[in-house]
């Protein structure tokens, strides 16, 4: 009987420590992901023939099992030109950068939802063969939302959308990435 009580006590102690360590397990965890970004740029109904493409980098920190914070950096770029009979008349370049951050809520052990708020910066430069050149840049509010999936405890799949309006230029950016959770 004494042996059985000791076994029950040790088993209960191990179970309690296991449960406590599961709660602590998510606290302080981080993840980093890198991925593909593609923007769609519109101005007064006109859009670029080819979408600017680039990359996205995200870092996430979990405060506890439910809440965390995420930071994001995105960059997309597209060069373009107008030619007549192989003769280049106009050369242009569009670049977009954003830095955003926001809260993360873990729905379950596999899925988390997050919101983003920060700054988006766009720069367009156009030059012609006649020596004329024009450049415009604008920084404005950027906001978005996304999901992170953890199909495996150490693997992250990230998908998000971000929007920014730079005066009359509207930039919507889709991002898809993968990363490591540690």
From Swiss-Prot:
Gene Ontology CC terms: cell outer membrane; host outer membrane
Keywords: Cell outer membrane, Membrane, Signal, Transmembrane, Transmembrane beta strand, Virulence
Coiled coil, from the record: none
Signal peptide, first to last residue: 1-26
Bilayer topology annotation: Multi-pass membrane protein
Pfam families tied to this protein: OMP_b-brl (PF13505)
Localization per record: Cell outer membrane
Top-rank taxon, per record: Bacteria
InterPro entries membership: Bact_OM_Invasion-Related (IPR051723), Enterovir_OMP (IPR000758), OMP/PagP_b-brl (IPR011250), OMP_b-brl (IPR027385)
Gene3D superfamilies: 2.40.160.20
Keyword Secreted (UniProt): no
Family in the record: Belongs to the outer membrane OOP (TC 1.B.6) superfamily. Ail family.
Purpose: Promotes the invasion of pathogenic bacteria into eukaryotic cells by an unknown mechanism.
Protein name according to UniProt: Attachment invasion locus protein
Organism: Yersinia pseudotuberculosis serotype I (strain IP32953)
The encoding gene: ail
């Amino acid at each position: 009987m004494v042996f059985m009580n000791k076994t029950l006590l040790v088993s209960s102690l191990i179970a309690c420590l296991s449960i406590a360590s599961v709660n602590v397990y998510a606290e302080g965890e981080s993840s980093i992901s890198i991925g593909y970004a593609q923007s769609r740029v519109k101005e007064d109904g006109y859009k670029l023939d080819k979408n600017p493409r680039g990359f996205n980098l995200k870092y996430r920190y979990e405060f506890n099992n439910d809440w965390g914070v995420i930071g994001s950096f995105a960059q997309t770029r597209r060069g373009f030109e107008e030619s007549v009979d192989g003769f280049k008349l106009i050369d242009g370049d569009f670049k977009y950068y954003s830095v955003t951050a926001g809260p993360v809520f873990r729905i379950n052990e596999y899925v988390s939802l997050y919101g983003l708020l920060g700054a988006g910066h766009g720069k367009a430069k156009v030059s012609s063969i006649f020596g004329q050149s024009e450049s415009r840049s604008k920084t404005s509010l950027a906001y978005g939302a996304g999901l992170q999936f953890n199909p495996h405890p150490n693997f992250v799949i990230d998908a998000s959308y971000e929007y920014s309006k730079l005066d009359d230029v509207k930039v919507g950016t889709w991002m898809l990435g993968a990363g490591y959770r540690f």
